[in-house]
Structures are given as structure tokens and as C-alpha cells.
UniProtKB/Swiss-Prot annotation:
The keyword Transcription does not apply. One of its GO terms (biological process) is maturation of SSU-rRNA. Monomer. Binds 30S ribosomal subunits, but not 50S ribosomal subunits or 70S ribosomes. PANTHER family: RIBOSOME-BINDING FACTOR A, CHLOROPLASTIC-RELATED (PTHR33515:SF1). GO terms for molecular function: ribosomal small subunit binding. One of its GO terms (cellular component) is cytosol. This is Ribosome-binding factor A. InterPro entries: KH_dom-like_a/b, RbfA, RbfA_dom_sf, Ribosome-bd_factorA_CS. It is found in: Cytoplasm. Belongs to the RbfA family. The lineage of its organism: Bacteria, Pseudomonadati, Pseudomonadota, Gammaproteobacteria, Enterobacterales. One of several proteins that assist in the late maturation steps of the functional core of the 30S ribosomal subunit. Associates with free 30S ribosomal subunits (but not with 30S subunits that are part of 70S ribosomes or polysomes). Required for efficient processing of 16S rRNA. May interact with the 5'-terminal helix region of 16S rRNA. Transmembrane segments: none annotated.
């Protein structure tokens, strides 16, 4: 019977849960604020993990940069706690990256909404002109 998920995918899912809990409960750095772990990619040999995060108030790029620096500084602490929680022989080295897919998704949604609104307004204006 074939496995539905590979070991790296299972480790990545579990790491995402654990890192989210650790950032929320254990990391006390005020520079981080409200961080959400949106995904984790683990290398095949489980030596490296890229952690994608978003922040609640990520309007300013400087705040995002500061928060990422704080997370990277705390990566050793987070890695230790992940190792204890997951009981892995090799705990991946953590690298934190900003995940802008949520912001890009909202931007694209706004663009589509504006285009639909403009199209509707254009149709209503041209429809009124044809009736007269």
C-alpha cells in the first residue's frame, strides 16, 4: 500500500503546527507581533526547513523586515523546542521568509472587483445612450 504523503510532507505539516504554537506562546520578542505560519517546506534530507510567515499588521516593509530578523534570531530557540516536541533525530535548520501570497491575493481580488465594477458602469452608460 502506497503512502499518501511522503515523510517530508508529514514532517512539514507537523513542523508548521509546532512552530505556530511556539511563536505564539514561547517567543516573547515584541518585534514579532502577531505572526502566522502559512507554510513550511522541508528539504528531502530533513536538514533545512523554509518557514513562510505573514504578519497581522504588515503594511510597512520595514516592520516586516524587523520581524523576520527577530524570528531568524530566535530560530535556534525555536529549533530546540521543535526538536523536543517532535522527537526528531535531525531537526532542520530554520529559515524564515515572508509570505506575500495573502497580500497579493487581496490585491488581485481588488483588481478583479474594480474591473467588474467599471465594466458594469460602462454597460449601464452605453445602454442608456442606446435607448434615447
Amino acid at each position: 500500500m502506497a503512502k499518501e504523503f511522503s515523510r517530508t510532507q508529514r514532517v512539514a505539516q507537523e513542523m508548521q503546527k509546532e512552530i505556530a504554537i511556539i511563536i505564539q506562546r514561547e517567543v516573547k520578542d515584541p518585534r514579532i507581533g502577531m505572526a502566522t505560519v502559512s507554510g513550511v517546506e522541508v528539504s528531502r534530507d530533513l536538514a533545512y526547513a523554509k518557514v513562510f510567515v505573514t504578519f497581522l499588521n504588515d503594511n510597512e516593509p520595514e516592520q516586516v523586515k524587523t520581524a523576520l530578523k527577530a524570528l531568524q534570531d530566535a530560530s535556534g530557540f525555536i529549533r530546540t523546542l521543535v526538536g523536543k516536541a517532535m522527537r526528531l533525530r535531525v531537526v532542520p535548520a530554520l529559515t524564515f521568509s515572508y509570505d506575500n501570497s495573502l497580500v497579493e491575493g487581496m490585491r488581485m481580488s481588488n483588481l478583479v472587483t474594480n474591473v467588474v465594477r467599471n465594466d458594469t458602469e460602462r454597460r449601464s452608460v452605453t445602454g442608456e445612450d442606446q435607448e434615447d
